[in-house]
Amino acid sequence: MCRYYSGLVYGGGMNKLLKLLQDGRFHSGRELGEALGVSRSAVWKHLQRVQSETALLLYKVPGRGYRLAEPLSLLDEDKLVPRMRAMGWALHLFDTLDSTNAEALRLLASGQAPLLVLAEAQSAGRGRRGRQWVSPFGQNLYCSLALEVHGGARQLSGMSLVVGLAVMQTLRQMGLPQAGLKWPNDVYVDGRKISGILLELTGDPADQCHVVAGIGVNVNMHEAEGIDQPWTSLNEWIGMVDRNELALTLAGKLKTYLDQHASTGFSGLRDEWEASHIWQHRRCTLSTGTQEFSGTVLGVDHQGGLRLMIDGVERSFSGGELSLRLDQ
């Protein structure tokens, strides 16, 4: 179901109901019915649909009404569109998508860019190396930025690391100063993952192409099934977060850092990235899928490749499905 697309509103009844309930307080069936212009029995049907389509937990208490088990911070078109438009980005806001990256690629095929896709939930969210990205409704931030890139390899090198830097600085500005980077583009807090990034290309990477930067940030999620690694969320550290404020802060950081990257390349941001790398000068193992290399992390090169000191010899690694882990 699509809520907003190019300024048009869909599925208004359900979204109006969620907006009323997002404060986490009790609302009577009469109050909800009057707001929606339907009977109390119809309200219950709407609520059942909300539960079915979003998996949100609802409480029904006789004499008090209905409330969500946890408050929500729904994405708000009125708050987001003006700022995105000022940056020159078209905003596409959805309730549920298969994947924000997949939708961004579909929109690119119709000739649109630059653009930002946001969704309340993903049914087939994707991370690096084909992993699932768990994407419950209204809990986290799922977004994809699609840009046109000219200049070939120079403009692409290090871009995923720059996006990670923008995400990390966003989290620090939101009140999480301990956020740090793990090569190539994950963001960690206290040894646990809080954000991941997936870059996908379409077109000719040697000349003109489009880049889709998919970003997932754990925001207000308390628990989740299907995550196979230690994770944390903003909520755990600073309490409930307004996801509109987070989205706008992230958009601003992305524009700042990507504009600088377009001007100076990754080399102009390399020192800042290395200063934030949580495993800098630590002994780690890099896996390529078929081989493993153990050594001390020296940093990154001017293209964003990982520099490892292996048996007294410095080597650089980039591209492919590489994975870095800390040696115990």
Residue ranges and their predicted role:
Residues 186:
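Conserved active-site carboxylates
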Residues 95, 181-183:
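Short loop/edge segments at beta-strand edges and connector loops
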Residues 61, 136, 182, 300-301:
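A short, compositionally biased micro-patch
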Residues 4, 10, 15-172:
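N-terminal lobe of the biotin/lipoate ligase/transferase fold
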Residues 2-39, 45-48, 53, 152-179, ...:
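Long, positively charged amphipathic alpha-helical accessory segments at protein N-termini or as interdomain linkers
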